[in-house]
């Protein structure tokens, strides 16, 4: 269905908006005319109590709280200013830029999730388009929603596969976003990659072992996708 609106609010079926979410979003739109995409705090409801070892995974699962200071930036790189699609207000200009990209290559649609494939870089590609049209991304702490994640998303087996998919997604995002590659060259040489794994084990030694394994899975996801040479390949 076509829309003439300048803004669209994305709400997933597991999102519960606070009662003032839309009102505060409209205030942001009026107060910051150059913003292109923005979102806020995505919080777990009190009824969901995952084990503590899952906490380092929260940013990857769209559970985020960067504090009470507003953050805004025009950037073609990821940062706390870039909202996930869940609960995001997105300007028409940004969506038109995404449409332009999809018209140039339908391979972009393979960047999203599909049965048996935990890829998840569609959101980032949309948000990175803001800088292409001269608009910013913003973290707006006045916006709050509860993210009712399914319990199976906190399972170790799922999180390892999810992090592996995140690694693959990073390579695909570079390929489709017109950005300079962000994947370092040491992924391409086996001996350097082995050194990277050892470095990961050392730097993450104080983190839960489940998270360390997840980070290593992320590294292998990057390595795998680079070896495929075709960013859209399974």
Where is each model-derived feature located?
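Acidic donor-binding loop at a coil-to-helix junction in glycosyltransferase catalytic cores
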Residues: 107-126
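Conserved nucleotide-sugar donor-binding
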Residues: 4-5, 84-100
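Non-catalytic, C-terminal membrane-associated alpha-helical segments of glycosyltransferases
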Residues: 161-165, 178-234
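Conserved donor NDP-sugar-binding/catalytic core segment of glycosyltransferases
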Residues: 20-54
């Amino acid at each position: 269905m076509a829309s003439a609106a300048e803004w669209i609010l994305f709400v997933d079926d597991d999102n519960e908006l606070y009662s003032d979410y839309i009102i505060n979003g409209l205030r942001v739109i009026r107060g910051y005319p150059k913003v292109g995409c923005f979102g806020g705090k995505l919080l777990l409801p009190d009824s969901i109590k995952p084990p503590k070892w899952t906490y380092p995974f929260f940013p990857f699962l769209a559970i985020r709280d960067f504090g009470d200071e507003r953050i805004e930036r025009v950037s073609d790189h990821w940062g706390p200013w870039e909202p996930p699609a869940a609960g995001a207000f997105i300007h028409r200009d940004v969506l038109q830029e995404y449409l332009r990209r999809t018209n140039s290559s339908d391979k972009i649609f393979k960047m999203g999730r599909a049965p048996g494939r935990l890829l998840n870089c569609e959101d980032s590609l949309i948000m990175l388009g803001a800088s292409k049209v001269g608009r910013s991304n913003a973290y707006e702490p006045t916006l709050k929603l509860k993210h009712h994640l399914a319990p199976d998303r906190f399972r170790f087996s799922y999180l390892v596969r999810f992090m592996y998919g995140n690694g693959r997604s990073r390579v695909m995002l570079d390929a489709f976003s017109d950005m300079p590659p962000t994947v370092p060259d040491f992924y391409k040489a086996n001996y350097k990659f082995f050194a990277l794994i050892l470095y990961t084990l050392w730097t993450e030694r104080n983190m839960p072992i489940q998270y360390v394994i997840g980070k290593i899975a992320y590294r292998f996801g990057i390595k795998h996708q680079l070896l495929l040479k075709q960013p859209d390949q399974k």
